[in-house]
Structures are given as structure tokens and as C-alpha cells.
């Protein structure tokens, strides 16, 4: 499941979009961006289990974090306080809500995207 990107030639916008799209296609409920000393470890939660997805190098770390915060309506200048945001996403004609939270850590901001697919909820 591990994914590689051409970080030197691919724009961060496309990398973020691909991570989100691919996670949705794989049936993930969460995307975790865990900052480390030298980059970000991206993991996705499928059926309650976290799977390693990709490693983001240090050179892309700040831009990727900023991109996620922009599309979720967060304050990009604030990195010392927790924040919450949201993304409305249309996938094959169905509306998905993506809830985004950021939390400051010693190595940067930890970001979690929760994928909410209301079409999968129980209808009664």
C-alpha cells in the first residue's frame, strides 16, 4: 500500500488531492499526517487499522501542511494552537464531509482528516 510521489516535480496541491482521493477510494475513515523530525508520516485508517501510506520529506512538509489548512478553512499563520476545519468533497456524485483537525507537536502540526460518508449510515 506504500505510495511514492515525485516530490521535486509534482505540485503540493496535486499530492494532497491524490492522498485524499486515493484514501477515499480505499475506503479509509481517517488520514493521519504525523510530523516527524525529518518529514511527515502519512497513514490511513481502513476498517479500524492504521496503514502506512507514504513519507513526506522535510522539504515539502511546510507546504503540505499549509495546503491542507487552506482547503479546510484554517488559519495558516497559527501553528501553536489546535484548530478545526472542514472540506466539502464531491466523489462520484455523492457528498462527503471531511473534518480536519490540527494539533501542535514538537515536530510540527499533526493533522487528521476524518472522512464522513453519510450515504453509508444506517437508514431507517
Residue ranges and their predicted role:
Residues 1-124:
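N-terminal "pre-motor" subdomain/linker immediately upstream of P-loop NTPase catalytic cores
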Amino acid at each position: 500500500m506504500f505510495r511514492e510521489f515525485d516530490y521535486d516535480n509534482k505540485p503540493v496541491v496535486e499530492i494532497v488531492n491524490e492522498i485524499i482521493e486515493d484514501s477515499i477510494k480505499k475506503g479509509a475513515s481517517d488520514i493521519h499526517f504525523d510530523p516527524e523530525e525529518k518529514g511527515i508520516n502519512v497513514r490511513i485508517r481502513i476498517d479500524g487499522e492504521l496503514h502506512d501510506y507514504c513519507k513526506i520529506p522535510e522539504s515539502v512538509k511546510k507546504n503540505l501542511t499549509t495546503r491542507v489548512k487552506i482547503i479546510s478553512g484554517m488559519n495558516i499563520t497559527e501553528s501553536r494552537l489546535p484548530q478545526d476545519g472542514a472540506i466539502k468533497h464531491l466523489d462520484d456524485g455523492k457528498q462527503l464531509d471531511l473534518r480536519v483537525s490540527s494539533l501542535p507537536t514538537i515536530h510540527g502540526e499533526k493533522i487528521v482528516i476524518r472522512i464522513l460518508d453519510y450515504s453509508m449510515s444506517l437508514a431507517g
